[in-house]
Structures are given as structure tokens and as C-alpha cells.
């Protein structure tokens, strides 16, 4: 896979003023492969299963605590 290059060039001359914009972006395959390796390591195999279980448990406790606090303040006796 070859790196993709994109460029934007804008130039305008009006009333003696000069505006110019020039942008260039290059996406490297090295960064993409690094991200892909990290995602494959964290999302597959035993480590991936452990990450999903830990994420599910953390999400459960966050929702549980938010529900508890909401119920406490909604049903609080005055």
C-alpha cells in the first residue's frame, strides 16, 4: 500500500491584497499499521476477551451507580 498524498492550493488577488492558502497532508502506512497492530492485539484472542469482559463490567457498574443515584434523588423523602 502506497502513501496517499493530498494537497490544497488557494490563491486570490483582489484590490492589491494577496491571500494564499497551501495545505498538504500525507498519510503514512506506518501509522496505519501501528494502529492496526494495536487494535488486533487488544480486540482478538484471550486479551481481547479479557478487555471486552472488563469493559462490560465497568459499563455495568457505571450504569448501576448512575441508576442508584438517580433513584435516590427522585424518591428522596422531603
UniProtKB/Swiss-Prot annotation:
The chain crosses the membrane at residues 47-67. Its main location: membrane. It is found in: Cell membrane. The modification N-acetylmethionine is found at residue 1. InterPro entries: SMIM1. GO terms for cellular component: cell surface; plasma membrane. Residues 1-18 have a biased composition (Basic and acidic residues). The keyword Cell membrane applies. Keywords: Acetylation, Blood group antigen, Cell membrane, Disulfide bond, Membrane, Phosphoprotein, Signal-anchor, Transmembrane, Transmembrane helix. The keyword NAD does not apply. Residues 68-78 are annotated as: Displays the Vel antigen. The modification Phosphoserine is found at residues 6, 17, 22, 27. GO terms for molecular function: protein homodimerization activity. It is a single-pass type II membrane protein. Residues 68-78 are extracellular. Residues 1-20 are annotated as: Disordered. Residues 1-46 are cytoplasmic. The extracellular domain carries the Vel antigen. Belongs to the SMIM1 family. Homooligomer; disulfide-linked. PANTHER family: SMALL INTEGRAL MEMBRANE PROTEIN 1. Regulator of red blood cell formation. This is Small integral membrane protein 1.
